[in-house]
Amino acid sequence: MHIKIQDENFNAESLAVIAILAAEGEPETVSLDPLRGEMRDFCRRVVVNENFRGEAGKLLVVPVADKTVRWAVIAGLGPEDKLTPERVRVAAFSAARAAASRGCSALSLTMPKAGDADRSRAAAEGCALASYRFNKYLARDEKDRFTAIEAVTVFDGCEKALEEGRILGESQCWTRDLANEPGCVINPEVLAAKAQELAAELGLACEIWDEKRIADENMGAYAAVAAGSANPPRFIHLTYEPENAKGHIALVGKGLTFDSGGLDIKPSEFMLTMKGDKSGACAVLGAIRAAALMKLPWKVTAIVAAAENMPGGSAYRPDDILRARNGKTIEVNNTDAEGRLTLADALCYASELKPDMIVDIATLTGACAVALGSTTAGLFTNDDEFGDKVLKASAASGERFWKLPMDDPNLRELVKSPFADLVNSAGRYGGAITAAMFLEAFVGKDIPWVHLDIAAADFAKTPFSYYVKGATGFGMRTLAELIREL
């Protein structure tokens, strides 16, 4: 998507779609800038007749009888004194989607105080997200019915913020594409190849380990999860390192390209959408992509322990005792609690790099989805100050996270095993918390760490807000926003 700024000599008559993001007010006063003359008068009459007040989430599409302008799209922002970047993002998405649904690939956009960087960034994100649809496997005639937004002109916007918003929105679409691919297409080797392609495109350092190297590196927990699959594991390590980096952040993503549950096999209906068990991995790859394209001043490491959890003859078993990279032993009492085993070795490795901070992101527990629903994800941390920075980034991105406690000593006891240092599943109650406590055992001492549990938030079963059905790319923009704000 191409995006540019128009100054005060805004030429509305040269564009097919005029999108106005309007703050709430009386129909007679709702802003219709930059419309002029007869077009403005006509749109005002429609606004008054429809009693359109610019409430958040409301959209009015006006067909315009003009030689070049075909539509005026007015999207409500709600009260200006309560205006947030998320409202701008949603309104811009709605306006751009309305243009695309009418076969228009370009639009102009205006809003109150467009020069505000946060508003410009959010508007560009919304427009970029409006172009998303995972349609590569549809018949050609079905593909051709969808119009993508290719060009956006913003009146009096902030140029740097608009470009950042474009990158963030397009990186989330890239993340969604990767997460939406089925297990028959994306296995660990293919995911590693995708990471290599990304590295080559952006000039990132890239290291890929095969199954022999993984075993040689003493990643016993990770290797055990991969043992039951005909598709071998791949360990992915990407690095973006600008000159004079301000610091170093490590991102660790869960990368199960498909999760059958292993020998503790899932019921068939629970296997649906398990192509999305790699969503954490896709999010960290999308985040390092965004960081590199925005040329952010922080060194970023993206780590993925990619594997497939299958019930083959060589699969790991309940009661097995595994040894992780840091020497800790783990009793397996549920082979479907596999993501934390792959993350354990990945977190050990990330800690050895001595970053200033670590964030892991994973579709980890059904317990988190039960607690918070499918549009809010869980946040856990060993450092409240760092956790608050991630929450601030999530608020700016519009991705909802809620901090859950990790200070209950009784729950911590449940993670212990009489036969090993830890047990990989501590039972049903407080399952999201005990999973986070398990992961904490593999984070280096004194390293600020945040764990993001995006189970259920990674996949939209029905369209809502700026999400279509399928992978959401949830968490990618929060990670990128965190790095941008550090």
Map each language-model feature to its residues:
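A generic structural signal for tightly packed, nonpolar segments enriched in small/aliphatic residues
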Residues: 51, 106, 192-486
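Short amphipathic alpha-helical segment within the helicase RecA-like ATPase core
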Residues: 1-255
